[in-house]
């Protein structure tokens, strides 16, 4: 697979799940905390799963906007994507994540909305990165 990279960014983490992460350009700096469910203190910071969920949700809206014109559709201004990301042990060993995307497209006919969601899932960079590795559920709110 070849990718014609148009944009590149980097982030650095220190301290692992109880540390901090920031982008090289300084636009994002987050304190990280391990959730109680994973044996941590559940502090005030964020965790990688939350950051992944936020990124996937935002990216998926962008993917819908990218494919909508070819479908002769417009993504409503009040469209939302809620990404729910889970983490846990895999039966094969190690840990894995799951993702469920709940998409709200007010004003679109159900068949149009479902077609748009499927088309976006084929081009979304997060969907392409997870395909074959992460169980991703798609639903229309």
Regions picked out by a protein language model, each given a short descriptive name:
Residues 1-54, 61-141:
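Extended beta-strand/beta-hairpin segments
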């Amino acid at each position: 697979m070849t990718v014609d990279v148009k944009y590149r960014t980097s982030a650095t983490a220190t301290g692992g799940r109880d540390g901090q992460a920031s982008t090289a350009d300084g636009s994002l700096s987050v304190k990280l905390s391990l959730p109680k469910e994973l044996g941590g203190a559940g502090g005030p910071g964020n965790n990688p799963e939350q950051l992944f969920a936020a990124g996937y949700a935002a990216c998926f809206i962008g993917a819908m906007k990218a494919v909508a014109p070819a479908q002769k559709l417009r993504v409503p201004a009040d469209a939302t994507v809620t990404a729910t990301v889970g983490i846990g042990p895999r039966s094969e060993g190690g840990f894995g994540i799951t993702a469920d995307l709940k998409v709200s497209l007010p004003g679109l006919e159900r068949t149009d909305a479902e077609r748009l969601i499927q088309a976006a899932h084929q081009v979304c960079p997060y969907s392409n990165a997870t395909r074959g590795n992460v169980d991703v559920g798609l639903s229309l709110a």
